[in-house]
Amino acid sequence: MQIETQELKSNEQPFLVTAYWLDPIADFEAPVKQPVMIICPGGGFTFHSERETTPIALKFLAEGMHVLVLPYQLRDATHEVYPMALNQVARTIEWVTEQTGRHSIDTDRIVLTGFSAGGHVVANYNGIATNPLLVKQYHLDQYAGQHAAIILAYPVIDLDAGFPTTSAEKNLITQDSQFWHAQTNVTDNAKPAFVWQTATDELVPAENSLRYVLALQKHHIPVEYHLFGSGIHGLSLATHVTQKPGKTKYLNKGASQWISLATNWLTQIQVIHNN
């Protein structure tokens, strides 16, 4: 495996991505093109949770996927999250397509994975980047490449559905209402989705994921949805690997199944397949 940190630019604003590239397997008679996952971690739009970066990357590397971690635009005193975050996703996808000469990449099998706030970015991208009018409006047409599917883990979907808790916080994320309700951006062209959450999520109510799943169904977009009966927000792997020290509430045997469930789903939709 090769780990690479790369500075990219979107609208002249630099940002960093970390790529985990699989090495070719010498035993194979010919190079095998592998799918790519791009991870947008959570953190309430104010930081990027490291519990949702490398531990997740290692799981999907083991399934034969190259993995990139994208620390998308956060909200701060001078910046809103949108639309810059979507431009960063688009530029990252484009950069992946530019690496085919260096790595064995299948550019038709790029998966976006978002946790919590990162799920809001990914869900919005899945709608806006597949809508020709909005692609032009937000200047996403300047980038090459497209994603094939998305995975959402306890995602923020609707900024009026429990997180954030005030209108002031919502406006710090973005004042552009196009991004407030990701479910309303879903179109018939959106990509297939795997979504999971817990019914007892105390920070981002499960209504968020439900709204998105219903929107996908309305537009006949393939979706697999798992709502686990109990568990806190921010479980990540839900195992000892991502457990915060001394806090057993981050252990959840039921929810920890999501990696194998998502891998099975990726196999079903032919993102992961036999060589």
Task: Say what each PLM segment does.
Residues R91-A168, I173, S177-Q178:
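Primarily recognizes the serine-hydrolase "nucleophile elbow" in alpha/beta-hydrolase
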Residues N189, V195-Q197, D201:
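Short beta-strand/loop motif that positions the catalytic acidic residue
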Residues Q217-N275:
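C-terminal catalytic histidine-bearing segment of alpha/beta-hydrolase fold enzymes
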Residues E50-L68:
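Short amphipathic alpha-helix adjacent to the substrate-entry channel of hydrolases
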Residues S49-E50, L70-T107:
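Catalytic nucleophile-loop/oxyanion-hole region of alpha/beta-hydrolase
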Residues K33-G42:
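Short beta-strand element of the alpha/beta-hydrolase
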Residues E202-R211:
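Conserved alpha/beta-hydrolase "acid-adjacent" motif
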Residues M1-V32, T165, G254:
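N-terminal cap/lid segment of alpha/beta-hydrolase-fold proteins
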